[in-house]
Amino acid sequence: MLELQKKYWTTLIAAGAVVSCGAAAYAAGFTLPAAPKIAFLYFDQKNDGGWTQAFDEARPKIETAVGMKIPFVEKVPEVAGQIKPAAEQFIQRGYNVIIGTAFGYSDTFKELSEKYPQVAFLNASGTTNGSNLESFYGRTYESQYLCGMIAGAMSKSGKLGFVAAHPIGPVNWTINAYELGALKMNPKATVTVIFTGAWNDPVKERAAAQAMADQGIDVIGQHVDTPTPQIVAQERGIYGTGHHRDLREFAPKATLCSSAWTWEKFLIPELKKVEAGNWQPNPYGAFPGIKDGGTDIACCNTVVPKEVVDKVMAERQAIIDGKHIFAGPLKDTSGKEVVPAGQNLGDAGLWKMDWFLPGVIAQK
């Protein structure tokens, strides 16, 4: 799956079809032939503690906004033979807005969107788009930058850790953003990264977090799907920052903040456009940040001093006002300039990010 993801993103970048909020939409607005009926396809169980649960927590907020109950089906694997019947069961019952939650749904959703041109399809972390299909993902580097600020401020050693799944663009940008945020508060901060090779592997995540604590790291961030790194941080008497959703419920003493999905803020406006008949799917997909909904910081644990929170919230507002996290000059660990002075890293550069800042130490 990892190699397939890399192949997709490389192809999209080469074609110029990288998700971007600024890309031109399809000329004609999509119109449903009947009142909208919305359904979700969940990749995992609804209470997985991370990615899927973030969608399930957004669902009741969406229900309130659109005035209808939204059913879902859990644990739909990234296999066409499972995705297609799950979606078609809803379509045959009159559901005409299908929301998916997995990269591996991309090709099947494209096929379904062509087979059912009067049904609207949206898919999180997907790569395919069309006149009635829009993939979307969030600018998580923005929220991870803010978490990095808190980590840098709260660390006594200046040694931060980060448990990550795979060294691919959307993970690497969270790591580099975390380091940039930490440097904002502590110019000597470093981030040691251990890749687990899996999105959801509590055993490997625990081993990675334990190894970090053994090295004297006193704040652990993450881009994996379970709260295990936060649980280990609490067990070891150190701090952590979460990902996907507010993870303080699992480690109330340790988790300082989280980079959290706020999908209702993105999906409610999109669904209202679908209902109004003026939805124009972005041909390159949607890429919302804090300003547009999709991602934000869940802040903060009461142990974080007010002056730190105030600085973080000021940076959050600066991001909303247009500040770009990856503003040059920036160099990678080899000393190569990756973002020139006076320039910002564009979306294509974000998706293909394969470099780390000098303060990032990647371990196997």
Question: Where are the predicted features?
Answer:
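A residue-level marker of the well-folded mature domains of exported/periplasmic proteins
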Residues: 5, 26-364
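Bacterial N-terminal signal peptides
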Residues: 12-22
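Bacterial N-terminal signal peptides that target proteins for export
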Residues: 3-13
